[in-house]
Amino acid sequence: MKTFFHIILSPLRWLAQLLGLLRTLLVNLILIFFLAALFMLTFSNDKVTVRDNTVLVLTLSGQIVEEQKIADPLTGALNSLGRISRLADETLLQDVVDGIRAGAADPRISCLLLDLKDLDQAGLDQLQIIARELLKFRSSGKKVIAAEDYYRQHSYYLAAHADEVYLNPMGLVDLHGFGIYRLHFKEALERLGVNYHIFRVGDYKSAVEPFSRDSVSDQTREQNRTLVHDLWQLYTDDISRERGLQPRTLELYTNHVVAQLAAAGGDPATLAWQTGLIDGLKTRQEISEYLITLSSPDTEQDFSQISLADYLRSDSIPYPEKKRKDSIAIIIAEGPILGGYQPSGAIGADSIGEQIKKARLDPDVKGLVLRINSGGGSAFASELIRQELLTFKKSGKPLVVSMGSVAASGGYWIATPADEIWAAPATLTGSIGIFAAIPTFEESLARLGVYNDGVGSTALSGSTDLTRPINPQLAQALQLTLERGYRRFLEVVAAGRGLEMSQVSQAAEGRVFTAAQARDLGLVDKIGHLDEAVAAAASRAGLTDYSVQTITRSDSMVNSILEMLRENGARMLISQSGWARLQEILSPFKQSLTGLALFDDPQRLYARSELILESR
């Protein structure tokens, strides 16, 4: 018998020893990892020296964001060190602004070179902010030069604001217009046996259409056509002004490309030059030789240059700005609105609530600018944030909202308490409406021969079980709650904006508006960017001499170390075009399905707008 048990237990003992060995190895690897991180933290912050007559290379990579995500710092750090990710997943907008401004005032910087080949995504509002800084840089008497193998839409917008724009002789300028396209899953869900129960208020509330339709509704099509037309007009007007083009030039270039290309002998680069989109055709070597004439040669074959990342670590950047006794605080609200504490890249009701409270209790903070770039999310979380902002206002400090590319639905809900709302020229806002969505999988399971049955103590027992058909009483209760939530949304807007309910109703039903339309409807006060909103807050606070500080969320030291590793590792990477292409292909699926993971509202009510503008 002992021999029998020995035979049975021996593999288990061996397995336990193996697990213990693996656990010890893992602990040691983590220890080495953190020691390396501490070493990098200690020695990687040395100031970079800038040589005289140096070209500042403004490299924009990944997505332009206003708050960098640290949602999974360990993965980010390992990806960067393992050369899995791109050169950088994100570029912080404020870093770009700081770098350009410092370069304009730095006598050692001779000119600025735009490096846009790895720029994946940016809102038109963000592009406009960077473009304004480029124009200010040019006004200092220094050149801005753009030179690429090819230009996509968002990268060309910035290039058009340069003094000189060059293109590789084998390149092209890809301008094709804006669009709003979404995948629709109704037929797929039916084939899978998934029953999606949709509840919504507002004919224009289109966030759930992909799960209930196979095509865009007439109302949504009408609305989106107006939005893309107005934003494209804004885009083309800016480019035509900076490039000195006739208004019809870009219309011919995009809508009659076949005839235009045929006239240019089928050569896209020649077409771009003949149209006036670029100033000349130059190879990479010719660009390098040209830049040597504008700077000190670093070697016989290259020019003296410094990257934006290194320049931000140099002694030229007065960053962060020294806090004065009187300051205007900025809080970034970017991403989906969710309950609880959320990492950077999402707006958590509790996490941003702490930031607002910090601004309220700080005696040196005399005013607050809430920078919103969000399509909304949980209605309950949005209301919690609004309540915290109302508490802030009781302190007597002014509250100003600055809207980014999108401030819609729940993003507009949290803007309503503001004393003053500024929307950027390219802002999309409104979408006053709410919805609820509950999928059930009883048919999916039945096809597999799996059924759910039993008894409950009340009529609502088991009503939240997604493997059962939706309870009729739950559906009716949810619709009543939804209608009450919609009325509450209208009341919040009316109270915050000083409008009659009839006026709000005309701007509701889930409609989305451009900044100009929203201003005409009384939903926003003025059109301008973040700088103007900060100045407005200072004016309301009676300040003329003040500093600006950004109140960030409190991250743990572990997260900070891991994020530092990610940033330092990213600088060692080369662009992974294959990986980037895969991400681009999967992007529509990610954008369409991400919303499913964000449904965390306790009442299942969502004030969210799915505005995905295809602008690349």
PLM region descriptions:
Residues R51, H161-D163, L192, G276, ...:
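Short, structured coil segments at secondary-structure junctions
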Residues T54-R182, Y319-S444:
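Cleft-lining beta-strand/loop regions that shape enzyme active-site pockets
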Residues Y166-L167, I278-R284, A423, V524-L530:
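Short acidic-hydrophobic, aromatic-tinged amphipathic segments that line or gate anion-handling sites
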